[in-house]
Amino acid sequence: MKQSEVKELSVAELQEELGKSRKAYSDLKMAHAVSPLENPIQLRTVRRDVARLATELTKREQQ
């Protein structure tokens, strides 16, 4: 998810997407631990998506 897409989401949508992304990251890490992923770069992209969402959520809560 790109930063421009993240900025357009509401706070409730951000929280929902953050939960989904964290779950996806957890699932990918578990799958990678059991057997190597075909594309391990997925871990990095999902982790960065989680960071983008969390950063935007924190920024909005402070305003």
Curated annotation (Swiss-Prot):
PROSITE patterns attached to this UniProt entry: RIBOSOMAL_L29 (PS00579)
Family affiliation: Belongs to the universal ribosomal protein uL29 family.
Q: Which organism is it from?
A: Christiangramia forsetii (strain DSM 17595 / CGMCC 1.15422 / KT0803)
Q: Which InterPro entries match?
A: Ribosomal_uL29, Ribosomal_uL29_CS, Ribosomal_uL29_sf
What protein name is recorded for this chain? Answer: Large ribosomal subunit protein uL29
State the Gene Ontology terms under molecular function: structural constituent of ribosome
The cross-references to NCBIfam families, in alphabetical order and at most eight, read: L29
Q: Does the keyword Ligase apply?
A: no
Q: Which GO terms describe its cellular component?
A: ribonucleoprotein complex; ribosome
Q: Which UniProt keywords apply?
A: Ribonucleoprotein, Ribosomal protein
Task: Give the domain of life.
Answer: Bacteria
GO BP terms in the entry? translation
